[in-house]
Amino acid sequence: MDTPKMGDLYQRIANQINEMIPSEWENVYLYAEILDDSSEVYFYFNIPGKNEFLYSHNIPEHFNVSEDIYDDLLIELQESFEELREEYEKNNPETWTNLTLKLDRTGQFSIDYNYEDVIASELNGSQRKAVWVYKNLGLMPKRKTVRDFLEDYIKTNEGKI
């Protein structure tokens, strides 16, 4: 169940994402993993007229943005997701561990919450990321070891991805 505070947090998160991207953009696909003792947030976005998706952590290099400014904005975004998780816990019997947020430039968004115990998962962080990127963007990893893993994973989990 969403609460008014969650609605405010969704708006704040959308604004923070917009502030982090130093250009016009079409779509954002964001992954947030918030656990009791750690958090990770990253996203991919595309620029109008281009099909290529850019990785959020490459913004400083790609757009010549200060790494310190980017890191500060990323920490603020992570804190917003931590606050969202706390608010969610107050109003729902089950706590999510990660989510996928899809946002377009008109402000339309969707959030898919996932309750999987990522600590107990057989996949490590880079493998989870590879699966998520493939599921949401259809992109294969560049690094051979991760690409080989994903190809095997796709074969093994055919129809589940």
From Swiss-Prot:
<protein>
    <recommendedName>
        <fullName>Immunity protein YezG</fullName>
    </recommendedName>
</protein>
<dbReference type="Pfam" id="PF04634">
    <property type="entry name" value="YezG-like"/>
</dbReference>
<dbReference type="GO" id="GO:0005737">
    <property type="term" value="C:cytoplasm"/>
</dbReference>
<comment type="subunit">
    <text>Monomer. Interacts with the C-terminus of cognate toxin YeeF, probably with 2:2 stoichiometry. The second YezG molecules binds with lower affinity.</text>
</comment>
<keyword id="KW-0963">Cytoplasm</keyword>
<comment type="function">
    <text>Immunity component of an LXG toxin-immunity module. These modules promote kin selection, mediate competition in biofilms, and drive spatial segregation of different strains, indicating that LXG toxins may help avoid warfare between strains in biofilms. Neutralizes the toxic abilities of cognate toxin YeeF upon expression in E.coli and in vitro.</text>
</comment>
<dbReference type="InterPro" id="IPR006728">
    <property type="entry name" value="YezG-like"/>
</dbReference>
<dbReference type="InterPro" id="IPR036170">
    <property type="entry name" value="YezG-like_sf"/>
</dbReference>
